[in-house]
A protein has these predicted regions:
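Primarily the internal scaffold of c-type cytochrome electron-transfer domains
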Residues: 33-55, 78-115, 145-502, 508-512, ...
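N-terminal catalytic scaffold of extracellular/periplasmic and nuclease hydrolases
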Residues: 71, 106-127, 137
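Conserved, well-structured interaction surfaces
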Residues: 125, 130, 134-141, 151
Length: 584
């Protein structure tokens, strides 16, 4: 019997409609028939520690920047016309952007890279600090100093620029980025421009609104607010989120650059991309494209936002206001921040971190991907075709190469489990994943799957200059595998090498812009139906194989600390999408 799973058919589960019976009522994934080996109900990792109030925002004045606390004096306690909280620092302080310098995974990874490549320590620390500690790095470079993170560098409480470093990706950095060469290679990898030679109070600080009122900010923080259309342009985000890192050969010689993350270039090669000559004001999107800010800094639905608490009378409420949510997909690290907020000295309370985490979960489960199933039975063989649709404007998983997503498919009969592929394990491993079981190997991309130890994992696998699998960024010369889900409209055959598809997916005609089709062929033996087919798209921020490689440097303080935090954290993946069908 043939069963199609569509929005109007037997069952369809994107995240807008949870698991459903034909009636459309919510039903637990294990409600019909025997429970699967692993539940496929909606899930995401949970925090394990008690609530904490959080420290105050960072307050400092340096040559070119001010701390977030100074900005919060006027830009907190904001509401839209319906009374919803629009406070900028209230939303920002619990994001990964605000905590970019305190992210313990990042700190551990940078320390590991430096230890493995000591000859280019200065290059590594400057490259990483430029986007994770951007105010301190920019201030140092403006004074012709040496950017340093460890030992007596920015991480030392005694360092002159410690406060500005620990304020992360903060207000007076992003809003001072000049409209110079944005969207070009000359601005990527942290090559943003700030007018460090301009003295107060004439130093420009950019916003998305025309004809700003200048005098309040000139007097309070020494900036002159001016209209800057770049603040509503993905190219501004691309200055750090298009990152090429140097790599070395086995002898330690720098041999080239590697595209560590390229979501802006992926976006530009998709239906979501907006041409540079079509830059538009906030709230005035004229076409089918969508900027980074429209997803990651969603507008107030109600409008009527007074953007400053002490606003001069001529400053009118704004109907288009970008909430500083900076929502991404990093649920796991937000949990780690919650679990360790005191030791990390976070400015965000437990509740604010929870708010950001819940926004992240909602984005993953409502706006990221959809699953659909078509299934049929012929004798003792079931054929199940799983379709995965990517709804975001870049590859998914996105950005840093530690992330992966995979299909967990389980088939049950009244007698028990018939077949299961991609079962998540409690320690974060994936049953059947070669990389988890045999170091130096990896799971290939599949068009068709017939064995339980074959798993469709959407990920990147990196190789060094000798062609061996590596998890050391500064040894990575190329991708052996990149089958991450492509955005709609992405033409893989004409993609530039830095955003290409690598491995078996490059030749898979069922893997293309916006979707992937995976066919499962399952022998039922002497088991009788009805058969319940359940599929889930699961997502993890740090793959176990990536983490196991980091453990090699557990003698380093930052690595030791993060290993401890990782080991006690909840490692269950986020359920991004689910689908279910019955075959009789």
């Amino acid at each position: 019997m043939f069963s199609a799973v569509f929005a109007g058919g037997v069952v369809f589960l994107g995240l807008t409609s949870c698991v459903s019976a034909v009636s459309g009522e919510r039903q637990d994934a294990a409600a019909a028939g025997p429970p699967p080996v692993t539940s496929q109900a909606w899930s995401y990792p949970k925090n394990t520690r008690a609530a904490r109030a959080g420290a105050g925002l960072t307050d400092f004045i340096s040559g070119n920047f001010v701390g977030s606390a100074r900005c919060g004096v006027c830009h907190d306690l904001l509401r839209d016309k319906a009374g919803n909280d629009m406070s900028i620092s209230n939303h920002w302080r619990s994001t990964m952007m605000a905590n970019a310098a305190k992210d313990p995974f990042w700190l551990a990874k940078v320390r590991s890279e430096v230890a493995r490549n000591p000859a280019i320590k200065k290059v590594i620390e400057e490259k990483c600090a430029t986007c994770h500690m951007p105010m301190a790095a920019t201030e140092t470079k403006a004074g012709h100093g040496v950017v340093a993170m460890f030992d007596d560098g920015f991480l030392s409480a005694a360092a002159k620029l410690h406060a500005s470093a620990m304020d992360g990706v903060s207000c007076s950095l992003c809003h001072q980025i000049q409209d110079e060469k944005l969207g070009t290679a000359a601005s990527f990898s942290g090559k943003y421009t700030v007018a460090t030679a301009q003295p107060a109070p004439g130093r420009p600080i950019f916003g998305p609104y025309r004809e700003p009122v200048a005098r309040t900010m000139q007097g309070s923080v020494g900036y002159t607010p001016v209209y800057g259309s770049q603040t509503n342009d993905s190219a501004l985000c691309a200055t750090c989120h298009t990152l090429f890192t140097p790599f070395v050969d086995a002898a330690g010689n720098v041999a080239g650059e590697f595209p560590e993350q390229t979501p802006y270039l992926e976006w530009r090669h998709s239906d979501f991309g907006v041409n540079a000559d079509r830059r538009y004001d906030i709230g005035e999107n004229p076409g089918q494209g969508m900027n980074c800010q429209e997803c990651h800094m969603p507008h107030s639905k109600e409008g009527g936002v007074n953007i400053a608490r002490y606003a001069p009378p001529e400053l009118q409420p704004k109907d288009h206001f970008s909430q500083h949510h900076f929502v991404g997909g990093n649920v796991f690290m937000l949990n780690v921040l919650q679990d360790n907020s005191a030791s990390l000295n976070l400015a965000a309370s437990f509740e604010k971190l929870e708010d950001t985490k819940q926004r992240t979960v909602r984005q993953l489960q409502n706006d990221t991907a959809d699953l659909a199933i078509e299934s049929r039975r012929a004798g003792d063989e079931l054929t199940v075709v799983v379709r995965v649709d990517n709804r975001v404007g870049h590859k998914f998983p996105t950005g840093f190469p530690s992330r992966n997503a995979w299909i967990h498919l389980a088939v049950q009969s009244p007698a028990g489990v018939v077949f299961e592929s991609g079962r998540p394990l409690a320690d974060g491993r994936i049953a059947g994943n070669d990389a988890d079981e045999k170091p130096g190997t990896f799971e290939p991309h599949y068009d068709a799957i017939s064995k339980p130890d074959q798993v469709q994992i959407y990920e990147t696998i990196m190789a060094d200059t000798d062609g061996a699998v590596t998890y050391t960024l500064l040894r990575t010369a190329r991708y052996l595998k990149d089958n991450r889900l492509l955005p709609r409209g992405f033409d893989k055959k004409n993609a530039a090498p830095e955003i290409g598809v690598y491995g078996e997916a490059a030749q898979d005609d069922n893997f293309g812009g916006g979707s992937d089709l995976v066919t499962y062929r399952i022998k039922t033996g002497d088991m009788h139906g009805p058969f319940i087919v359940r599929a889930a798209l699961l997502y993890s921020v740090i793959s176990v194989n990536f983490m196991e490689d980091l453990r090699r440097d557990a003698g380093l303080a930052e690595v030791t600390s993060f290993v401890r935090q990782f080991d006690r954290a909840d490692k269950q993946p986020v359920t991004v999408a689910v689908a279910q069908a019955e075959i009789r």
